[in-house]
A protein has these predicted regions:
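N-terminal helix-rich module
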Residues: 2-8, 16-19, 25, 30-59, ...
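Glycine-rich phosphate-binding loop
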Residues: 13
Length: 161
């Protein structure tokens, strides 16, 4: 029942309050964010994470070489890599692995411009098979077929950005 003695008669209101509109917009934004994140290919995440894992393992081999008188490195194959000590397979365990090797997820491959292995000397510098310092940047490429991630190792210093 509408009271007529009010200066502005109260009428039935149709519509939404500003609070309701804001809540709906926030909920839709949150749902859209999850849909966009989940819609990205899994191999994109795998490629990024495998790139960081490989960098960590390269740094580990470099650290071991700097803590030892022998060279340390990683031997590369199309679907993974393994730890090397004095250019032969090592039995030491890679960080966060259960053994001296790491297998890449299916669909991701690895190639290196320097060949099938990356070695570091006691100064942490990348060296070739004959222990000569490398004069060019060493590049290791991880690929999932549509995207690539390149890891570069700086000559002489062994810096891995």
């Amino acid at each position: 029942m509408i009271r007529s003695d009010l200066p502005y008669p109260k009428t039935e209101q149709n519509g939404f309050t500003m609070f309701e509109v804001i809540i709906v917009v926030v909920v839709i934004s949150i749902v859209a964010a999850f849909v966009v994140v989940r819609g990205t290919s899994k191999t994109v995440y795998d490629l990024a994470s495998e790139s960081e894992i490989l960098k960590g393992h390269l740094r580990y081999a470099q650290y071991r070489a700097m803590s030892d008188t022998e060279s340390w490195g990683l031997g590369l194959s199309a679907n993974g890599y393994h730890l090397l000590k004095n250019k032969i397979a090592a039995s030491d365990i890679l960080p966060n692995e259960s053994g001296p090797s790491h297998t890449l997820p299916s669909g991701i491959t690895i190639t290196a411009g320097a060949g099938t292995a990356v070695h570091f000397n006691e100064r942490g510098s990348p060296v070739g098979d004959g222990d000569a310092l490398l004069t060019a940047e060493t590049e290791i490429v991880l690929s999932d077929g549509s995207a690539t991630r390149t890891i570069s190792i700086t000559p002489e210093t062994g810096f891995i950005p």
